[in-house]
Amino acid sequence: MGSNLSPQLCLMPFILGLLSGGVTTTPLSLARSQGSCSLEGIEIKGGSFRLLQDGQALEYVCPSGFYPYPVQTRTCRSTGSWSTLQTQDQKTVKKAECRAIHCPRPHDFENGEYWPRSPYYNVSDEISFHCYDGYTLRGSANRTCQVNGRWSGQTAICDNGAGYCSNPGIPIGTRKVGSQYRLEDSVTYHCSRGLTLRGSQRRTCQEGGSWSGTEPSCQDSFMYDTPQEVAEAFLSSLTETIEGVDAEDGHGPGEQQKRKIVLDPSGSMNIYLVLDGSDSIGAGNFTGAKKCLVNLIEKVASYGVKPRYGLVTYATYPKIWVKVSEPDSSNADWVTKQLNEINYEDHKLKSGTNTKKALQAVYSMMSWPDDIPPEGWNRTRHVIILMTDGLHNMGGDPITVIDEIRDLLYIGKDRKNPREDYLDVYVFGVGPLVNQVNINALASKKDNEQHVFKVKDMENLEDVFFQMIDESQSLSLCGMVWEHRKGTDYHKQPWQAKISVTRPSKGHESCMGAVVSEYFVLTAAHCFTVDDKEHSIKVSVGGKKQDLEIEEVLFHPNYNINGKKEAGIPEFYDYDVALIKLKNKLNYRQTIRPICLPCTEGTTRALRLPPTTTCQQQKEELLPAQDIKALFVSEEEKKLTRKEVYIKNGDKKGSCERDAQYAPGYDKVKDISEVVTPRFLCTGGVSPYADPNTCRGDSGGPLIVHKRSRFIQVGVISWGVVDVCKNQKRQKQVPAHARDFHINLFQVLPWLKQKLQDEDLGFL
């Protein structure tokens, strides 16, 4: 800060197994055969290739809007030659090439017409559907050919309502056999040669008018699900399961409850995480899978969901790291620690791919001893999330274990109560070597839900988990951010507010603040004077240029910057906090979200503490008597940047506070407690690390503790000893006595509670 002491102005049971292709990107110009096959003559016209599995396979890569013809992948055979380039009708091709992606035409469309008709459709082409008289259109009347070779929208269906079940439709690219829709009637679907059917090949009309299974589609080898498609479909299905548990616990499945469910001690969810550690995955993908799972565990926990976890890795044999029966299996932090300690090398000596054995390990955790079911067994919902390429090479067909699990859970045995809601098997295929037939066979088939996905690589899979988790119903939860690499500054600091005060003939002052509710921004009192008018105060949030209208500024009643002038202290910053009340309610979005405040119910949930947690216990958790890692957010070159600091709250606290005497105007203060009251937190200095310092424009911003993937504000930036940002540039070399002082929010809680009493924050 300035040398004249001017003030400173950031669930349910899952089984997750991973088998991937072990991708190594290999630029064409640098390619070297790592296997026994030569790379000579394998180029693709208009594209490139990359080696997989240490040179034992390769993938052809084409620009967006194109696909590799006639195949996407080739394998190195034992004879030392690459697999033949063959078309879908078994014709041999001399050289691979990149061809433009087309969308398939409708083979059949019942009870209506579509236009225009063409043998194929180019990207961006549109088709329209309409029904004959007496039939009603369901689905999308207009559909567009997308760059991934799929049609936008939903299957168009013309139905007259005459059947017991509605017409299940004919997805574009498929053929349907069967046109009777009476109870127990069935229809079957088929794909053209070379395409793979995803979903249910056979569907049966069931009691209640619903169809068994899920809508099929025909997939080409080059087709991948986008991260957005996967996230939306998976989250939609996942929410159905959570809502079902919520309803059984006696709660209505309200919109705000979908991600706030805390399961009772008997537990109605288990999560089994199963990772493949075989040769086919590769060390890099194994690490990426762990990262995805850690993120999933953290985020599920951050919503207040406390399922029990099982953790298994496998190759030739499975290894159980965490059992759902263990006392700590519902402790997300403990499970994450166990996951992080697993190494890819743990299965190095036995590196086959035995998916069946892995699922049997899960079955063993689901089952009960002596064949006597425990009380409440039939209320536990099971979800299996399996990430695999479907290329199991030993142990037999894993689908038999899925059948055994269904039998154990009494699923599909009673026509009137099939209990399908109690088991969901999601299968994620990762990479180009995915066997689409095998992964489709393992996945659940449920009406209007998707359980099988194919993503291009581990990077796309990480995108899925980011997009899947940050859905709109969580926007009101405090201290949550979107940490994705594509996120903007305000995705990563959605609480941050910029404040500007314009004073005629005196210029303007810039400060920061934090969104704490839909109507209030918390900042520093010294950013304003009693003469400032509401219209002269500008507040912006979410990175938007449009300023918010101000209703009033509320100062802490004990704040008085001139309170000790008679004692020779020119500026006194005790109780330096203020609340800006907005005229209009904020609409939360990913770039505008509240930060957590101490001693609120939201912070109790964020810290995963028991509901009975007291304010004192929160304080002990957030501000223990030691050096505390914290952060603040500063603007540098028009970008928001997090600065990591340490709050000196242990043996370094005294020396940190004594350095206040180096501030201009405080050099003659005999008792430093006259200016550094118990309401201040101190950062800065060079021990235990050299802390960055705040600048003038950082005043009023939040001092934050980042814990358990949530951000909790513990202080408000107030003043500093040294102006480290002279001439609008942060100095790299600063003295050891460069300290910053922040108002401790735990010390002003009565005022916060009074002013924010109508904001539904649940102060303790």
UniProtKB/Swiss-Prot annotation:
List, for all copies, the residue spans of the domain called VWFA. Answer: 270-469
Q: Where is the Sushi domain?
A: 35-100, 101-160, 163-220
Please tell me where Mg(2+) binds in this chain: S278, S280, T353
Q: What is its EC number?
A: 3.4.21.47
Question: What enzyme category does the UniProt record give?
Answer: hydrolase
In terms of domain of life, where is this protein from? Answer: Eukaryota
Give the record's PTM text. Answer: Cleaved by CFD following activation of the alternative complement system, generating Ba and Bb chains. Cleavage and activation takes place when CFB is already associated with complement C3b.
Q: Which Pfam families match?
A: Sushi, Trypsin, VWA
The record's listing under PROSITE patterns reads: SUSHI (PS50923), TRYPSIN_DOM (PS50240), TRYPSIN_HIS (PS00134), TRYPSIN_SER (PS00135), VWFA (PS50234)
Q: What is the first-listed, main subcellular location in coarse terms?
A: secreted
Keyword Secreted listed:
yes
Give the annotated active site: H526, D576, S699
One of the record's GO molecular function terms: serine-type endopeptidase activity
Would you identify the family this protein belongs to, as annotated?
Answer: Belongs to the peptidase S1 family.
So what does this one do? Precursor of the catalytic component of the C3 and C5 convertase complexes of the alternative pathway of the complement system, a cascade of proteins that leads to phagocytosis and breakdown of pathogens and signaling that strengthens the adaptive immune system. The alternative complement pathway acts as an amplification loop that enhances other complement pathways (classical, lectin and GZMK) by promoting formation of additional C3 and C5 convertases. CFB is cleaved and activated by CFD to generate Ba and Bb chains; Bb chain constituting the catalytic component of the C3 and C5 convertases.
Q: What is this protein called?
A: Complement factor B
Q: Which gene encodes it?
A: CFB
